[in-house]
């Protein structure tokens, strides 16, 4: 897999973006600049509530957005701009819960199309693979993942390769027995860490990244702790 020339190219460029606080700082900078404010004098916690509702379904909204960005700055900004667009169209003074929900759904659909193409470019056998996850549970065990992959027409050694791709692109994470969910960007894009962590936990399951769940109609499970 590592011999594929383009594999993970974009993720490796963004390796430094693994800290939510760094992304939040970037968002503060972009917002301040867009509002013609002095970034050095802007406190995120003071500015954000003026632009967006503070919580969505009990979760702080900037954290909610960042958790669905795959830790990519441009994705974080896409979500915000989608939500802002819905708020503007409805003449809302700030982004409300319904605007954020619609924004995340629009972003999720864009991301689904984008990542499906990206996967197909580096692994042609994976064409349309993400669409086979439509209406599936948030958590899937090894047997369920293999069944979905086979349904997509992938078999043999390609099954393991494809699952590796899904992990590396952040589409799937690994949930261990302690309920923590680990995605590739939380282990500095070291696939070995995810695979060894899974191998050590007999009861591990794969977890769909929340970024894709709205577009795929994923059935949500109890709230997970994401690392």
PLM region spans:
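Short, well-ordered loop/turn and helix-capping segments at boundaries between secondary-structure elements
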Residues: 29, 33, 82-85, 89, ...
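Short, amphipathic alpha-helical interaction segments positioned at domain boundaries
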Residues: 186-227
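The catalytic "switch" region of P-loop NTPases
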Residues: 1-58
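Short amphipathic alpha-helical interaction segments
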Residues: 152-169, 174
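Short, Lys/Arg-rich nucleic-acid/phosphate-binding segment
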Residues: 176-182
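C-terminal/domain-terminus segments
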Residues: 88, 147-152, 161, 183-194
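Winged-helix-like regulatory helical subdomains adjacent to P-loop NTPase cores
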Residues: 58, 67-157
